[in-house]
Amino acid sequence: MSLGLVGRKVGMTRIFTAEGDSIPVTVLDVSDNRVTQIKTVETDGYTAVQVAFGSRRASRVTKPLAGHLAKAGVQTGEILKEFRIEADKAAELSNGAVIGPDLFEVGQKVDVQGVSIGKGYAGTIKRYNFGSGRASHGNSRSHNVPGSIGMAQDPGRVFPGKRMTGHMGDETVTVQNLEIARIDADRKLLLVKGAVPGAKGGKVFVTPAVKTRAVKGAK
């Protein structure tokens, strides 16, 4: 249970180390994360912090949500996100407080969650990296078919989870243990090593890494 940030994927670029090594990074805009509600065990049954990100026209906000944000004294947001945290950390925050990239530090490992790019209806070759059939030598109109999907009368059905054609992408994906390569505090940017799910402009959630990789040989 850790506090995180809501951000927007700006795109990918690269930075250079002092030794001249090139590092591919994804730029995340995490500006203007503001607290809209502090949930406690007494009032809500659990402890969490609700954060708003981005902006939205007042005409596009429902009256209940507009009242909720007005009560907190917070500008209308494009998205609301809850982070479950400990009670002592929640007590340090208040409605309207702004959370910035200083929540993290360079070298820290984080988990980044986003919605992957939708690819539409795809075959098994593109979707699951299946191999193609033979181009000739007896193969007739079966070059890209997946092959058999079942057995005989017993069991007489296709097992659940069978890899077949279908909708590809547009799924919630979490990439774990990405390292923060650089923090631009002035522009509220996080530069994360490697790729992040989603297209440019997509929303992402950045939280401290849950699973840390063990160092081989360490005691």
From Swiss-Prot:
Residues bearing N5-methylglutamine?
Q153
Describe how it is modified after translation.
Answer: Methylated by PrmB.
GO annotations of cellular component type = cytosolic large ribosomal subunit
Residue numbers spanned by region Disordered: 133-153
One family name in Pfam for this protein: Ribosomal_L3
User: Which keywords describe this protein according to UniProt?
Assistant: Methylation, Ribonucleoprotein, Ribosomal protein, RNA-binding, rRNA-binding
Q: Name one GO biological process term.
A: translation
Superkingdom is: Bacteria
MF terms from GO for this chain are: rRNA binding; structural constituent of ribosome
Extract the Gene3D superfamilies matched here.
Answer: 3.30.160.810, Translation factors
The family line of this record is: Belongs to the universal ribosomal protein uL3 family.
Q: How does it assemble?
A: Part of the 50S ribosomal subunit. Forms a cluster with proteins L14 and L19.
The name on file for this protein is: Large ribosomal subunit protein uL3
Q: Which organism is it from?
A: Burkholderia thailandensis (strain ATCC 700388 / DSM 13276 / CCUG 48851 / CIP 106301 / E264)
